[in-house]
């Protein structure tokens, strides 16, 4: 069938958008859907149709009912000096955003930390989680169920690990509420973010549990104790994805000459804004100035699951005055990133990861994803430092007026 024939059928409602993939090659199907939509809504979509993506490469992998692609400006910051266990050296970091002044802000923070010797970064924990919820008729059955899980842990581990070459079950943590039990499974997932990997593994385990402990009714493979795409205490306390810490000691001359401030003032603002202000506002774990800005921009650029910004931007900014220098650290308990799979395979996202030398599987497995996590945490620290400094000297509004609105200031 020709494209124009498919377009006509779409406009008449004789076929649905998803059925086009059965009639045309993937790229032709994308064109047909877009042309039909243009006729249906009466709007031309030439920009959406202009893309470098080969849709035959992402069919049944990244999106459905595709009509084109959205483009977001991509900027670069750096070089930032990172002294991590996996990221060692100077790195340029790609950031995709439509927020004027963000990239310039982060870049000034990077200049300050690099002139002060760079950022030290460490991945303290690395595990992706999934937590199915089991329903019981009575709490009488729960102690035996927990004992069953403990006694069959190795068998469960073998079942889970058999579903993937890279997924390795590390632990199972039970949580009980009434006649409900959540089992929070934690996995190593190599260089993948690992959400699909652990879901497939846990589904197999749940089949085994229901077959061998019939009173356990697995209602859902995800019971929200995982906790995916939500700001939760369980992620802040136990971690999800990478738990990363980064620190730097900013020299007094750098604070004065680059940031136009002083250590005591930046520290005071951090305590009153990021800690007292956040506590008074009632946030669970967002004790920071703008982690979300930096993490989101890097997530978009590198093909991460952007919805996971909810938990990936949770974290804490800590400062101390040391003489006239400023100690600053950031802690991200649930940074969920990968360098293989998902959106990382898209051509522009692949190139963005390659800028930092982290595309694909690392050697050993998992090292590239941890390297990326250390780079992100170091960039987040730089963004926090600069924003706190900008607040201390009343530069925030001027920066956004100049770079966000193109106003003369």
From Swiss-Prot:
Enzyme class: oxidoreductase
Enzyme Commission identifier(s): 1.1.1.34
Catalytic residue list: 99, 305, 400
InterPro entries membership: HMG_CoA_Rdtase, HMG_CoA_Rdtase_cat_sf, HMG_CoA_Rdtase_CS, HMG_CoA_Rdtase_eu_arc, HMG_CoA_Rdtase_NAD(P)-bd_sf, HMG_CoA_Rdtase_sub-bd_dom_sf
The entry's keywords: Isoprene biosynthesis, NADP, Oxidoreductase
CDD domains documented for this protein: HMG-CoA_reductase_classI
Coiled coil: none
Temperature impact on function: Optimum temperature is 85 degrees Celsius. Stable at 90 degrees Celsius.
Catalytic activity: (R)-mevalonate + 2 NADP(+) + CoA = (3S)-3-hydroxy-3-methylglutaryl-CoA + 2 NADPH + 2 H(+)
Pfam families named among the record's database cross-references: HMG-CoA_red
PROSITE patterns referenced in this protein's UniProt entry, alphabetically: HMG_COA_REDUCTASE_1, HMG_COA_REDUCTASE_2, HMG_COA_REDUCTASE_4
pH dependence per the entry: Optimum pH is 5.5.
MF GO annotations: hydroxymethylglutaryl-CoA reductase (NADPH) activity
Superkingdom per UniProt: Archaea
GO biological process, one term: isoprenoid biosynthetic process
Functional pathway: Metabolic intermediate biosynthesis; (R)-mevalonate biosynthesis; (R)-mevalonate from acetyl-CoA: step 3/3
Family, per entry: Belongs to the HMG-CoA reductase family.
Function: Converts HMG-CoA to mevalonate.
Protein name: 3-hydroxy-3-methylglutaryl-coenzyme A reductase
Natural source organism: Saccharolobus solfataricus (strain ATCC 35092 / DSM 1617 / JCM 11322 / P2)
